[in-house]
């Protein structure tokens, strides 16, 4: 396996950070951090997330800025972690049947049916409404990443109440 240069890893980490900074404020909340870690294949419990946040949060503001994340994670990041992001893109592409960079309702319905999970019209509408955050009628890779992150956060029991 070819080695990845640290500058490439930082760029990839910045892209990942931006994808999970759901409110685009330049920092990650506990929920956003949990979703990011889950996407990297790291599966900490809720109490571990709190502890990790406290350790990473060097300026004590209760959230993680990109530079804090780099200091904490770069020594441990490896190609295997970055491959998980590639796998997410592969899943997205499998739904994006025409390869135009977005998933339509028809593509979502077709893919779900092909996987043995046909959707009712209502289920399809609810899924599209939840995932399509900008309301353009299709799901972009960013929206897909966010919905996958939200699913991971829900799974971890870290949803905001």
UniProtKB/Swiss-Prot annotation:
<comment type="function">
    <text>Potential calcium sensor.</text>
</comment>
<feature type="binding site">
    <location>
        <position position="96"/>
    </location>
    <ligand>
        <name>Ca(2+) 3</name>
    </ligand>
</feature>
<feature type="binding site">
    <location>
        <position position="143"/>
    </location>
    <ligand>
        <name>Ca(2+) 4</name>
    </ligand>
</feature>
<feature type="binding site">
    <location>
        <position position="100"/>
    </location>
    <ligand>
        <name>Ca(2+) 3</name>
    </ligand>
</feature>
<feature type="binding site">
    <location>
        <position position="23"/>
    </location>
    <ligand>
        <name>Ca(2+) 1</name>
    </ligand>
</feature>
<dbReference type="InterPro" id="IPR050230">
    <property type="entry name" value="CALM/Myosin/TropC-like"/>
</dbReference>
<feature type="binding site">
    <location>
        <position position="25"/>
    </location>
    <ligand>
        <name>Ca(2+) 1</name>
    </ligand>
</feature>
<keyword id="KW-0479">Metal-binding</keyword>
<keyword id="KW-0677">Repeat</keyword>
<protein>
    <recommendedName>
        <fullName>Probable calcium-binding protein CML16</fullName>
    </recommendedName>
</protein>
<feature type="binding site">
    <location>
        <position position="32"/>
    </location>
    <ligand>
        <name>Ca(2+) 1</name>
    </ligand>
</feature>
<feature type="binding site">
    <location>
        <position position="136"/>
    </location>
    <ligand>
        <name>Ca(2+) 4</name>
    </ligand>
</feature>
<dbReference type="InterPro" id="IPR002048">
    <property type="entry name" value="EF_hand_dom"/>
</dbReference>
<feature type="domain" description="EF-hand 1">
    <location>
        <begin position="8"/>
        <end position="43"/>
    </location>
</feature>
<keyword id="KW-0106">Calcium</keyword>
<feature type="binding site">
    <location>
        <position position="61"/>
    </location>
    <ligand>
        <name>Ca(2+) 2</name>
    </ligand>
</feature>
<feature type="binding site">
    <location>
        <position position="107"/>
    </location>
    <ligand>
        <name>Ca(2+) 3</name>
    </ligand>
</feature>
<feature type="domain" description="EF-hand 4">
    <location>
        <begin position="119"/>
        <end position="154"/>
    </location>
</feature>
<dbReference type="GO" id="GO:0005509">
    <property type="term" value="F:calcium ion binding"/>
</dbReference>
<feature type="binding site">
    <location>
        <position position="98"/>
    </location>
    <ligand>
        <name>Ca(2+) 3</name>
    </ligand>
</feature>
<feature type="domain" description="EF-hand 3">
    <location>
        <begin position="83"/>
        <end position="118"/>
    </location>
</feature>
<dbReference type="InterPro" id="IPR018247">
    <property type="entry name" value="EF_Hand_1_Ca_BS"/>
</dbReference>
<feature type="binding site">
    <location>
        <position position="134"/>
    </location>
    <ligand>
        <name>Ca(2+) 4</name>
    </ligand>
</feature>
<feature type="binding site">
    <location>
        <position position="57"/>
    </location>
    <ligand>
        <name>Ca(2+) 2</name>
    </ligand>
</feature>
<feature type="binding site">
    <location>
        <position position="68"/>
    </location>
    <ligand>
        <name>Ca(2+) 2</name>
    </ligand>
</feature>
<feature type="binding site">
    <location>
        <position position="59"/>
    </location>
    <ligand>
        <name>Ca(2+) 2</name>
    </ligand>
</feature>
<feature type="binding site">
    <location>
        <position position="63"/>
    </location>
    <ligand>
        <name>Ca(2+) 2</name>
    </ligand>
</feature>
<feature type="binding site">
    <location>
        <position position="102"/>
    </location>
    <ligand>
        <name>Ca(2+) 3</name>
    </ligand>
</feature>
<feature type="binding site">
    <location>
        <position position="132"/>
    </location>
    <ligand>
        <name>Ca(2+) 4</name>
    </ligand>
</feature>
<dbReference type="Pfam" id="PF13499">
    <property type="entry name" value="EF-hand_7"/>
</dbReference>
<feature type="domain" description="EF-hand 2">
    <location>
        <begin position="44"/>
        <end position="79"/>
    </location>
</feature>
<feature type="binding site">
    <location>
        <position position="21"/>
    </location>
    <ligand>
        <name>Ca(2+) 1</name>
    </ligand>
</feature>
<dbReference type="InterPro" id="IPR011992">
    <property type="entry name" value="EF-hand-dom_pair"/>
</dbReference>
<feature type="binding site">
    <location>
        <position position="27"/>
    </location>
    <ligand>
        <name>Ca(2+) 1</name>
    </ligand>
</feature>
């Amino acid at each position: 396996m070819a080695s990845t240069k640290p500058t490439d890893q930082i760029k990839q980490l910045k892209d990942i950070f931006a994808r999970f900074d759901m409110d685009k404020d330049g920092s990650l909340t506990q929920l956003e951090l949990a979703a990011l870690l889950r996407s990297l294949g790291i599966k900490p419990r809720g109490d571990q997330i709190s502890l990790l946040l406290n350790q990473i949060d060097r300026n004590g503001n209760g959230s993680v800025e990109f530079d804090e994340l780099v200091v904490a994670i770069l020594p441990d990041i490896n190609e295997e972690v970055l491959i998980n992001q590639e796998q997410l893109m592969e899943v997205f592409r499998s739904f994006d049947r025409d390869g135009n960079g977005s998933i339509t309702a028809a593509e979502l319905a077709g893919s779900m049916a092909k996987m043995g999970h046909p959707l009712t019209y209502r289920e399809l509408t609810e899924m599209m409404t939840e995932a399509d955050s900008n309301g353009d009628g299709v799901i972009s890779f960013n929206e897909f990443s966010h919905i996958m992150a939200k699913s991971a956060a829900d799974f971890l029991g870290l949803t905001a109440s």
